[in-house]
Amino acid sequence: NLAGERFPDWATERDRERVLGAVREALSKEAPELSMVPVSGIEAQERDILCESHLISKDLLKRAAGGGMAVARDGTVCVMVNEEDHLRIQGFAQGLDMQSAWRYADELDTRLERRLTYAWSPRLGYLTACPSNVGTGLRAGVMLHLLGLRLLGEIEAVVSALERMRLLVRGIGGEGSEAAGQIYQVSNMDTLGIDEAGIIRRVTRICAEVVRQEYNARVRLLQESPLVLVDCLARSLSVLQNARLLTTAEALEFLSALRLGAAMGLCTRLKVADVDSLILMMQPGHLQKGLGTAMTSDERDEMRADFLSRKVARVKLKC
């Protein structure tokens, strides 16, 4: 947050517009590769696409005045202006490469701080609208696909253990969302009393252990419960190849199973990256943009089923 300015939820429209202008000016001078776009200037379909890509939040889209966003062309860093706080700087990286994600965000933060004065307390650190973010103001989050643990009935125990270690466990859409497709977002709960490097090391270490447990669960599925695994894959592939209507949630559940099969080498003509692409492309905004037309919910369900059936038509199981 900027020093001397009201937090967004307490600010007037004029206050938020002033903050947006200050951030736009700072970006133009220190990070010209990122161009600021006001929320009011983003079309409805593009809003859906940005949300589905996890670049902006639904809360930001509710800002009729003073909301803004800027994203790098390669998608490694994104800035939200006047969401819950004046600035939300996000860094993204694939895999468990938390250091790169942190570096992208930290480098931009350092450049912006040359032009902006942040609200900071010697006793508390960075001041934020939500007390749970006070201190470093850092959330280090990892997306994990844990279908193997789910099929073995062990996911609840893992989630409980993570929460006891003061980690937040949410669905793919973040706070308040369900873990559709057994994709979980795990992040630090504490931001006060520990520095940024310590947060990143801790989240990385614990998530690496969860990944190890998921790999172990997949091995045990093959060795001890192969019928459970094969049935899950066969049912999902059959529905995706033959369904005439598919909601977003249904498609994600079935694609989750194919992602597991691809990762375990049990599907022909299918890689994990292919499934990740399909998971994004079957979302409402991406689907409509890809097909070049706006559709009703029922029309999207029909076109989603047709789109996915064509994409997985040649996929077969090796088991």
Positions of PLM-derived features:
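Long, Pro/Ser/Thr-rich low-complexity/intrinsically disordered regulatory tracts in eukaryotic proteins
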Residues: 1-123, 138, 150-152, 157-319
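Conserved phosphate/anionic-ligand binding catalytic regions in large, soluble enzymes, centered on
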Residues: 125-144
